[in-house]
């Protein structure tokens, strides 16, 4: 991806002068012609990997299971998507903002988005030397979280805070 600029937060932020190998693959089961499902694989150098097993049902594409890895080995969830990340510094607020996208553009594209059931994040394994989250800075952070019925169950350890977190859907 030399010549391409990424304005994503670190560690996927890059200038046009920086080179970053990128790979994109779609594996379709033999004989199915991709009608029932496929596997999507992405990689950006050794920094980022993703893999999603997708089903195609009733005009919708559903992510059945997958994994996202940032400076970690790729692991797939049994159901939903597992995110594993480690970084010296990680700004969760910046990532949340970047992944939310432009609300105006998202509203205009709602017709196209209607065929999707969203991104089924089911688990999180995070390690960071410094984590910025919800306007706070935490150091030497380990965060493990799983989606349970009705919300998230998480365990956080850091220099500043340690404990269990339950985040309920409203």
Language-model features and meaning:
Residues 1-40, 51-170:
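Membrane-proximal interfacial segments on either side of biological membranes
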């Amino acid at each position: 991806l030399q010549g391409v600029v990424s304005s994503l937060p670190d560690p996927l932020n890059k200038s046009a002068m920086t080179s970053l190998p990128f790979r994109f693959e779609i594996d379709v089961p033999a004989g199915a012609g991709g009608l029932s499902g496929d596997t999507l694989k992405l990689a950006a150098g050794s920094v980022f990997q993703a893999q999603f097993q997708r089903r195609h049902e009733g005009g919708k594409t559903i992510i059945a299971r997958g994994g996202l890895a940032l400076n970690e080995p790729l692991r797939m969830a049994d159901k939903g998507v597992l995110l594993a990340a480690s970084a010296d510094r990680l700004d969760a607020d910046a990532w949340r903002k970047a992944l939310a996208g432009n609300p105006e553009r998202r509203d205009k594209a709602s017709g196209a988005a209607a065929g999707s059931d969203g991104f089924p994040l089911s688990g999180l394994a995070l390690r960071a030397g410094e984590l910025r989250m919800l306007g706070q800075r935490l150091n030497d952070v380990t965060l493990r979280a799983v989606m349970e019925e009705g919300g998230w169950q998480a365990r956080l350890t850091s220099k500043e805070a340690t404990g269990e977190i339950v985040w309920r859907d409203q």
